[in-house]
């Protein structure tokens, strides 16, 4: 599949500068060649831009002035333009309408005529599935679930009973939506399991990565709000709420009843204790332990930066003696204060 730059601009906007070439592929800036188009995210890639052999480049207005003889698409945000162009070149696969003979569908289900239910998918009783959905092989949907339009459940996704999935949601392979939350009460010498009676609600335009788990609520629902993006291997515990358009990177753990606001970003391997709240537009660095509520938007981090093993071991030794250091500093402060007083006292 190939497109002229003129066609691309008509579809996606932007401004065409230079010759109207035809391109068939997207490629990284430093590797792009004939028939390929690349984007320049910012001026820090100026050298790679000037050396690039790409047939066309997506650039800002400021950078376009440095490339008077090249084929360009000028855009306010080249990275966003690249994302939309990638979708033009690689549109989502349309469902093949129908229910495969080897799929299992329970009683009382309502499934949109344009949706695809693949081989070995299992759908419980009284499930509602909208139009243009794709349920791939090995998907399991429990009783009473509601699934909107244009939803894709990749192979071996499990949706437990009574969960609600909005429109244009994607859940990737191996993820489990609606498993029991970790609710236990201590009874003398053993744990007593607390029934988890809430649901999981994934609102419109949510995407869940591979092997991620979202636990159902104990009494109220666990809710992932509109447009939130969750990466692979993320654990979201019961009663958690993730705000609209928040993005969470891989290997994050969020303990129960925590609420993360809208339009936040969370770096990989960050951990959240339970029963805290995080303000809208908060940005958490990778590896951070969030141990208390964050009431003001901003950038937060608590992980040590990378250093050599030798330096780390040396610093670790000092950390072990921080209490001794603190006592010595206090003693020095007392001695300094005594010395000051002695100098201030009149001498006979």
Swiss-Prot record:
Homotrimer. InterPro entries: Hexapep (IPR001451), LpxD (IPR007691), Trimer_LpxA-like_sf (IPR011004), UDP_GlcNAc_AcTrfase_non-rep (IPR020573). Transmembrane segments: none annotated. Keywords: Acyltransferase, Lipid A biosynthesis, Lipid biosynthesis, Lipid metabolism, Repeat, Transferase. Its EC number is 2.3.1.191. Pathway: Bacterial outer membrane biogenesis; LPS lipid A biosynthesis. GO terms for cellular component: membrane. SUPFAM superfamilies: Trimeric LpxA-like enzymes. The keyword Lipid metabolism applies. This is UDP-3-O-acylglucosamine N-acyltransferase. One of its GO terms (biological process) is lipid A biosynthetic process. Disulfide bonds: none annotated. It catalyses: a UDP-3-O-[(3R)-3-hydroxyacyl]-alpha-D-glucosamine + a (3R)-hydroxyacyl-[ACP] = a UDP-2-N,3-O-bis[(3R)-3-hydroxyacyl]-alpha-D-glucosamine + holo-[ACP] + H(+). It is an enzyme of class 2 (transferase). It comes from Chromobacterium violaceum (strain ATCC 12472 / DSM 30191 / JCM 1249 / CCUG 213 / NBRC 12614 / NCIMB 9131 / NCTC 9757 / MK). The active site is at residue 238. Belongs to the transferase hexapeptide repeat family. LpxD subfamily. Catalyzes the N-acylation of UDP-3-O-acylglucosamine using 3-hydroxyacyl-ACP as the acyl donor. Is involved in the biosynthesis of lipid A, a phosphorylated glycolipid that anchors the lipopolysaccharide to the outer membrane of the cell. One of its GO terms (molecular function) is N-acyltransferase activity.
């Amino acid at each position: 599949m190939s497109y002229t730059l003129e066609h691309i601009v008509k579809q996606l906007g932007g401004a065409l500068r230079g010759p109207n070439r035809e391109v068939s592929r997207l490629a990284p800036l430093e590797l792009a060649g004939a028939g390929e188009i690349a984007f320049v995210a910012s001026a820090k890639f100026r050298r790679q831009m000037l050396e690039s052999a790409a047939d066309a480049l997506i650039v800002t207005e400021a950078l376009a002035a440095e490339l008077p003889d090249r084929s360009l698409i000028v855009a306010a945000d080249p990275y966003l333009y690249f994302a939309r162009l990638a979708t033009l070149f690689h549109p989502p696969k349309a469902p093949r309408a129908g229910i495969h003979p080897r799929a299992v569908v329970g009683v009382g289900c309502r499934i949109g005529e344009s949706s695809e239910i693949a081989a070995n998918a299992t759908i419980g009783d009284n499930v509602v599935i909208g139009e243009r959905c794709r349920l791939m092989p090995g998907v399991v949907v429990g009783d009473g679930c509601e699934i909107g339009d244009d939803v894709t459940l990749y192979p071996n996704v499990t949706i437990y009973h009574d969960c609600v999935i909005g429109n244009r949601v994607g859940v990737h392979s191996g993820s489990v939506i609606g498993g029991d939350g970790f609710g236990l009460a201590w009874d003398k010498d053993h744990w007593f399991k607390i029934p988890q009676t809430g649901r999981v609600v994934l609102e419109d335009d949510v995407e869940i990565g591979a092997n991620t788990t979202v636990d159902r609520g104990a009494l109220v629902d666990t809710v992932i709000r509109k447009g939130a993006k969750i990466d692979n291997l993320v654990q979201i515990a019961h009663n958690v709420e993730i705000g609209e358009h928040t993005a969470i990177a891989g290997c994050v753990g969020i303990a129960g009843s925590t609420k993360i606001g809208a339009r936040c970003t969370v770096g990989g391997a960050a951990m959240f204790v339970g029963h805290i709240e995080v303000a809208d537009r908060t940005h958490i660095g990778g590896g951070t332990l969030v141990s208390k509520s964050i009431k003001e938007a901003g950038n937060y981090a608590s992980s040590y930066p990378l250093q050599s093993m030798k330096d780390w071991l040396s610093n670790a030794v000092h950390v072990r003696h921080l209490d001794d250091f603190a006592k010595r500093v206090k003693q020095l402060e007392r001695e300094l204060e005594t010395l000051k007083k002695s100098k201030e006292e009149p001498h006979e």
